[in-house]
């Protein structure tokens, strides 16, 4: 019988108390690569997709 315990995954998803002030920044960090991807299209539009 396979016993999977997912409580460790839940605990790892929460920042320790010492890093609580950085929580809003951590929420935004995954969006940054998407912004760079969109910036590439803006850049290519600026140079007329050469």
UniProtKB/Swiss-Prot annotation:
Keywords of this entry: Chloroplast, Membrane, Photosynthesis, Photosystem II, Plastid, Reaction center, Thylakoid, Transmembrane, Transmembrane helix
Subcellular location: Plastid, Chloroplast thylakoid membrane
Membrane topology term: Single-pass membrane protein
Coiled coil region boundaries: none
Propeptide: 1-13
Main location: plastid
Disulfide-linked positions: none
GO cellular component: chloroplast thylakoid membrane; photosystem II reaction center
Gene Ontology biological process terms from the UniProt entry: photosynthesis
Pfam families with a match to the protein in the record: PsbK
Description of how the protein assembles with itself and partners: PSII is composed of 1 copy each of membrane proteins PsbA, PsbB, PsbC, PsbD, PsbE, PsbF, PsbH, PsbI, PsbJ, PsbK, PsbL, PsbM, PsbT, PsbY, PsbZ, Psb30/Ycf12, at least 3 peripheral proteins of the oxygen-evolving complex and a large number of cofactors. It forms dimeric complexes.
Family to which the UniProt record says this protein belongs: Belongs to the PsbK family.
Protein name as annotated: Photosystem II reaction center protein K
Organism: Euglena myxocylindracea
Phylogenetic lineage: Eukaryota, Discoba, Euglenozoa, Euglenida, Spirocuta
Recorded name of the encoding gene: psbK
């Amino acid at each position: 019988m396979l016993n999977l315990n997912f409580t460790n995954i839940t605990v790892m998803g929460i920042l320790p108390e010492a890093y609580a002030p950085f929580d809003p920044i951590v929420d935004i960090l995954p969006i940054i690569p998407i912004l760079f991807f969109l910036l590439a299209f803006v850049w290519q539009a600026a140079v007329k997709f050469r």
